[in-house]
Amino acid sequence: MAKIKPVHILIVEARFYDDMADAMLDGAKHALDAAGATYDIVTVPGALEIPAAIAMALDGADEGGAEYDGFVALGMVIRGETYHFDIVANESARALMDLAVSESLALGNGILTVENDEQAWARARRTEGDKGGFAARAALTMIELKQRLGAEK
């Protein structure tokens, strides 16, 4: 990854599975710290609330609040016995993609959709899949791309 200007990131984490959220957040913070980025963290109840929180942050910036160079979405959706998994997985991904495209956001999507706890932990831990770190590095890469393309707002 190329050297980018100092950046400020908003991490939005869903706390539906607290222990897994902690593991994902650890990976994201480690990646951002290694890159010299600063960040704020907000928590929401579940994955479906993450896009709304990002939209609120954008509205807040328009009104003089904190401005963010990029966003990291962290959450875990584990398949259960109902159709709810499909709704949460599909709609959270769709809403994040809509925001990223319509607002030209540098966004790392770390909302994991898995079949069971074993898959979740294998992806959440920094010592294994490190998907929290991956999402943070994706956001940093997209920030660098925005800067290189002159798409900064």
UniProtKB/Swiss-Prot annotation:
This is 6,7-dimethyl-8-ribityllumazine synthase 1. It is an enzyme of class 2 (transferase). GO terms for molecular function: 6,7-dimethyl-8-ribityllumazine synthase activity. 5-amino-6-(D-ribitylamino)uracil binds at residues 16, 47-49, 76-78, 109. Belongs to the DMRL synthase family. Pathway: Cofactor biosynthesis; riboflavin biosynthesis; riboflavin from 2-hydroxy-3-oxobutyl phosphate and 5-amino-6-(D-ribitylamino)uracil: step 1/2. The active site is at 84 (proton donor). CDD domains: Lumazine_synthase-I. Keywords: Riboflavin biosynthesis, Transferase. GO terms for biological process: riboflavin biosynthetic process. Its EC number is 2.5.1.78. It comes from the Bacteria. Pfam families: DMRL_synthase. One of its GO terms (cellular component) is cytosol.
